[in-house]
């Protein structure tokens, strides 16, 4: 049996302002070169989202030699496309709704109260960039975690291939969606 990370994950195009460049450099630095694999890892983690990051930091703190493999951006969907972006936009819309109803509370606002969607999106990008510092490659490296970018494929019960390199391990954890395919029997 082999496990492959699905190929439908990709790095979405984003505006390249200073805030986005900061975020991308923390989550997948331009010009990144995967490290030379260790002879054997105590733990290989596939997926650099919240679960993978917590597992990597925790195992490294306990003394394990850890490799983390991510296909796209560290931080996963939650930071980059899901939870964080949606919650910041939801907060803006709720605030607008509260301000629109300010008269109920004895406050008055201009009649032409409007949401500047461009400013709301810029706020979301700033928040994402700030949070990305906690999920950064530098923080993982400081913890002693080897970070590899690329597609992961198990090629034996104790090894995974990523970007042409073979990573041997004692234990592995898939913390992102994976596809299971039965190999030759």
Language-model features, listed with the residues they occupy:
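Glycine-rich Rossmann-fold phosphate-binding loop(s) that bind the pyrophosphate
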Residues: 47-50, 71-72
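Residues forming the Rossmann-fold NAD(P)(H) cofactor-binding site
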Residues: 53
């Amino acid at each position: 049996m082999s496990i492959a990370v699905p190929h439908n994950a990709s790095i979405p195009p984003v505006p390249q302002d200073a805030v986005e460049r900061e975020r991308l450099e923390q989550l997948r630095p331009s010009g990144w070169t995967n490290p030379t694999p260790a002879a054997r890892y105590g733990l290989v983690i596939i997926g650099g989202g919240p679960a993978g990051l917590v597992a990597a930091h925790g195992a490294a703190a306990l003394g394990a030699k850890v490799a983390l493999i991510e296909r796209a951006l560290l931080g996963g969907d939650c930071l980059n496309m899901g939870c964080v972006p949606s919650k910041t936009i939801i907060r803006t819309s709720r605030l607008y709704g509260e301000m629109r109803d300010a008269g109920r509370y004895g406050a008055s606002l201009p009649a032409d109260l409007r949401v500047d969607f461009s400013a709301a999106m810029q706020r979301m990008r700033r928040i994402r960039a700030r949070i990305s510092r906690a999920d950064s490659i530098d923080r993982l490296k400081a913890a002693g975690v080897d970070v590899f970018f690329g597609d992961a494929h198990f090629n034996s019960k104790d090894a995974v291939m990523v970007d042409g390199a073979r990573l041997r391990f004692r234990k592995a954890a898939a913390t992102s969606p994976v596809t299971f395919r039965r190999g030759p029997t």
